[in-house]
Regions:
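Outer-membrane beta-barrel translocator/channel fold
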Residues: 55-122, 129-130, 135-165
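A generic structural micro-environment signature
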Residues: 7, 34-36, 138, 150
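A near-ubiquitous, low-amplitude feature marking generic local secondary-structure context
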Residues: 2, 25-28, 74, 123
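Cleavable N-terminal export/targeting peptides
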Residues: 1-23, 166-167
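A generic structural signal for short, solvent-exposed coil/turn residues
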Residues: 11, 20, 34, 46-48, ...
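Short glycine/proline- and aromatic-enriched beta-strand/turn motifs that initiate or cap beta-hairpins
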Residues: 19-64, 157, 163-167
Length: 167
């Protein structure tokens, strides 16, 4: 019995431990942005050492306005006012760690279009992740986007989302 316990201890100390290093996730996030904006992001995230990550994302944005005829937000003034989309990349260095949670800065760039012009974007923000069983993560994100040639120069807001493991 003593030799079996010694063998188990030797195997346990000799093997390498990887705690979510080099893991990949698909994430979906939805949020509200100032002023009168909704944002949806679908992304693929590759996590490297120490919870640093690279994110490749597709983003859609809608800005609604009040209807000219009725003075309320109606389907036409919501869906057909201003829309844009973009594709980009973001680097997310980890700045805080704890048990089952970590926080990352989010620094990135994107390119896309509204219904008329090409848009370029610079993205800055903070993202906090909470790890759930089976590799799932919940996250909230404070984002600030600078959009070049867009209707909004600055977009800022909060996004809530979920990340699902790929492997």
């Amino acid at each position: 019995m003593k030799s079996i316990m010694m063998a188990v201890a030797l195997i346990a100390t000799a093997s390498t431990i990887k705690a979510q290093t080099n893991s990949d996730r698909i994430s979906v996030g939805v949020g509200a942005l100032y002023e009168r904006g909704l944002d949806m992001t679908i992304s693929y995230e590759h996590e490297t050492k120490y919870h640093n990550a690279w994110e490749y994302f597709a983003n859609g944005y809608i800005k609604w306005d009040e209807c000219q005829s009725c003075g309320h937000v109606c389907p036409d003034s919501f869906w057909r006012n201003y829309r844009s989309y973009g594709f980009g990349i973001a680097y997310k260095p980890c700045v805080s760690r704890g048990r089952n949670h970590h926080g990352n800065l989010r620094i990135g760039a994107s390119g896309g279009s509204d219904t008329k012009n090409f848009l370029g974007g610079a993205h800055f923000g903070y993202e906090h992740n909470y790890t759930l069983p089976r590799g799932w993560k919940l996250y909230w994100q404070v984002k600030s986007d600078i959009m070049i040639k867009g209707e909004d120069l600055f977009r800022t807001g909060v996004v809530l989302g979920v990340k699902l493991p790929v492997k």
